[in-house]
């Protein structure tokens, strides 16, 4: 079993490296194939050993081998998180068909986190790709009842759209469409829980930032990472969280 976990971790960090490329290039409308990976500062094309996920960053001490400019920590961090999420997905779900939903689900969240942190943008191309993928997957591996996906998508979109109107643009269009996509994968209860958790985590982060004077009340904070955390917790722990809440209020 250790080798299986190791396999998912290695596959995860490899895909994590690719997701970094997708999250950084697609918002700029650049090809994810050409040009090949290079230093954004000096243009140095990376050798194969400079592309090894996580380890190349450590071996190069976080700097470009050519110009010595520091490499963004987002690369190894997101690679590591992807590897851990792939392992955790298998740990929670095992070799079942739902794993084919879980892995794309966490993949979407990694990509939009990279994109939102880097540009405060969640591209439509990414959302459309994963929406089509989830429609196909949920047709084969449906929620119960099957129409829960449609309800989750509709409620996710409307809920965020209303908040965007009430907050006068406080919620971006990418966040609205993202919740619609997540709603299709999660269903009604899942998307509502994801919304609650992401809002709670985002609010606590903002409050902490204001208390420590790292943020002001007018600071623009990308909401994508908080959506990702809330969605992951909802996807893997929906039943446990609702059970805990019911026990709490009874």
Predicted regions located by residue number:
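Alpha-helical membrane-inserting segments
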Residues: 19, 23, 85, 89, ...
């Amino acid at each position: 079993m250790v080798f299986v976990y190791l396999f998912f971790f290695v596959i995860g960090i490899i895909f994590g490296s690719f997701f970094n490329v997708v999250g950084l290039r697609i918002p700029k409308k650049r090809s994810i194939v050409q040009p090949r990976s290079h230093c954004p500062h000096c243009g140095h094309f990376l050798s194969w050993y400079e592309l090894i996920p996580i380890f190349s960053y450590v071996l190069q001490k976080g700097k470009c081998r050519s110009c010595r400019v520091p490499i963004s920590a987002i690369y190894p961090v997101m690679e590591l998180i992807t590897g851990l999420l792939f392992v955790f997905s298998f740990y929670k779900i095992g070799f079942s068909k739902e794993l084919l939903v879980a892995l794309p689900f966490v993949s979407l969240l990694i990509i939009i986190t990279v994109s939102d942190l880097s540009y405060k943008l969640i591209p439509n191309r990414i959302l459309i790709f994963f929406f089509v993928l989830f429609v196909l997957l949920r047709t084969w591996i449906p929620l119960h009842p099957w129409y829960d996906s449609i309800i989750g998508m509709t409620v996710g979109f409307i809920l965020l759209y209303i908040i965007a109107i009430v907050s006068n643009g406080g919620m971006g269009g990418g966040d609205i469409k993202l919740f619609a996509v997540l709603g299709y994968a999660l269903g009604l209860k899942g998307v509502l829980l994801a919304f609650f958790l992401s809002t709670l985590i985002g609010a606590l982060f903002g409050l902490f930032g204001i208390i420590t004077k790292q943020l002001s009340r007018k600071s623009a904070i990308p909401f994508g990472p908080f959506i990702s955390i809330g969605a992951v917790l909802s996807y893997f722990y929906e039943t446990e969280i609702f059970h805990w809440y019911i026990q709490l209020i009874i």
